[in-house]
Regions:
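Conserved PLP-binding catalytic core of the aspartate aminotransferase-like
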Residues: 241-252
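Conserved N-terminal alpha-helix of the aminotransferase class I/II PLP-enzyme fold
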Residues: 1-46, 74-78
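Conserved PLP-enzyme active-site core in the AAT-like
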Residues: 37-236, 248
Length: 252
């Protein structure tokens, strides 16, 4: 039977298709991201998987930043081979390498900013321009930045990933992920999301909502602490500091 319309919006007739608690979290993140819609997944890597499988098909190619989060590399470089999906990597410090990697089979540009392993910052506007010029889909892992610092969909990306396990949660007691999308890719992601069953449970959604209440306070303190730690380590002769806000660094 048709589920009754919930007062806060939507039909809730089957838990895997959404609950009132996950709906509230989606609306909170939608406002933060300034996007068309936000999908919720059980883990951050679930959002990585969903973003790729929503738009990439056998015979397509992906261009990803090198290095990327190691599980993402394992997925793109190894696992996807069995689906006849090829991944090539570009140097995030030289976007000319990105342009040179594009072929007629290229479907998706996968970006991390900053990079998970070595914290490179990239010219995101230029990447978006390259993607649009070549009619490619674009996705960015924005876990480090979160929409508190960066709003990728507003900037021009098609999809934006955040591992809610990290800063959104803030208490090390919940796993989850979010995938913000624009209108262009909404139907692709919605279809894949329903079929794969990558849905966040209401209890986890509740804990993430709790964490979001202090997100700004925690990130401001993280920023202050990082500057102090970086300043200390920069004076250590046996430490190589990969910190983008250090004077003289490539990304300063």
């Amino acid at each position: 039977s048709k589920g009754k319309k919930n007062p806060i919006g939507g039909h809730f007739e089957y838990g895997r298709q959404g609950t009132s608690t996950t709906y509230i979290l989606q609306q909170m993140l939608k406002r933060m991201e300034e996007c068309y819609h936000v999908f919720l997944t059980p883990t951050g890597f679930g959002s990585v998987f969903l973003s790729i499988f929503s738009v990439v098909r056998p015979g397509d190619e992906i261009i990803a930043a090198d290095p990327v989060y190691s599980p993402t590399r394992l997925l793109t470089e190894n696992f996807l081979k069995s689906f006849n999906i090829k991944t090539v990597f570009y140097n995030p410090n030289d976007l000319n390498t990105l342009k040179k990697k594009i072929t007629k089979k290229t479907k998706l540009i996968y970006v991390e900013n900053p990079g998970s392993n070595s914290f490179e910052f990239q010219d995101l506007s230029k990447i978006i321009s390259i993607a649009k010029k070549n009619k490619l889909f674009s996705v960015i892992d924005n876990t480090w930045g979160t929409p508190y610092y960066l709003k990728p969909i507003k900037l021009g990306f098609d999809m934006s990933i955040v591992s809610a396990t990290k800063y959104y949660s803030g208490h090390s007691d919940v796993m989850g992920g979010s995938l913000a999308v624009n209108k262009r890719v909404f139907k692709y992601v919605e279809k894949a999301n329903k079929i794969t069953g990558l849905r966040l449970g209401p209890d986890d959604a509740y804990l993430i909502i709790r964490g979001l209440r202090t997100l700004d306070v925690r990130l401001d303190r993280h920023e202050e602490n990082a500057k102090k730690v970086a300043s200390f380590l920069s004076r250590h002769k046996k430490v190589k500091l990969l910190y983008p806000y250090k004077k003289g660094s490539y990304n300063y």
